[in-house]
A protein has these predicted regions:
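Conserved N-terminal glycine-rich FAD pyrophosphate-binding loop of Rossmann-like flavoproteins
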Residues: 38-58
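Conserved N-terminal helical subregion
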Residues: 2-8, 25, 52-151
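N-terminal Rossmann-fold NAD(P) dinucleotide-binding loop
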Residues: 17-18
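Glycine-rich FAD pyrophosphate-binding loop
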Residues: 25-45
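Conserved N-terminal Rossmann-fold NAD(P)-binding element of oxidoreductases
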Residues: 11-12
Length: 151
């Protein structure tokens, strides 16, 4: 199967699904994404993303957007919950960039989701909401899916 010419269906519009759809579309693959929710809504809390992920986001052209919505801590400090005594720290900031080629970032899940959503839309990925997947049939190189809504 040549993913350059074969259409790909991504089931699920969370961070992982959007990231997969974006990565595939940037390679020239025709991508369709289905999501069971009727709308993308703000869900979740803050997440931390390491340099490997921020490097990928940069490679996907999302660095400017990431810089607008994320924070980039200079260090992480672990403290004893009762006494507040510092147990250890991990220098980040410029050190992370020097060692790993990209920064460590903290971002709200909804902001990362929105960044990826806007990127897949700009790539022309077909988004179909309100599509609950109920069956997947794999026969050889072909996969057929069925949703409750008849897709």
């Amino acid at each position: 199967m040549d993913i350059q010419t074969t259409g790909i269906l991504v089931a699920g519009g969370g961070i992982g699904g959007l990231a997969a759809a974006l990565a595939l579309s940037l390679r020239g693959t025709d991508v369709q994404l289905i999501e069971q929710a009727t709308a993308f809504t703000e869900v979740g809390a803050g997440i931390q993303i390491g340099p490997n992920v921020t490097r990928i986001l940069r490679d996907w052209g999302l660095e400017a957007g990431l810089r607008r919505v994320a924070s980039f801590p200079h260090e992480l400090v672990a403290r004893d919950a009762r006494s507040g005594r510092e147990l250890g720290n991990l220098p980040l900031g410029a050190r992370a960039v020097r060692l790993y080629g990209a920064p460590y970032a903290c971002i709200h899940r909804a902001d990362l989701h929105q960044l990826l959503l806007e990127a897949v839309q700009a790539q022309g990925v077909s988004l179909r909401l309100n599509q609950r997947l109920v069956e997947v049939l794999a026969l050889g190189d072909e996969v057929t899916v069925r949703t409750e809504q008849g897709l």
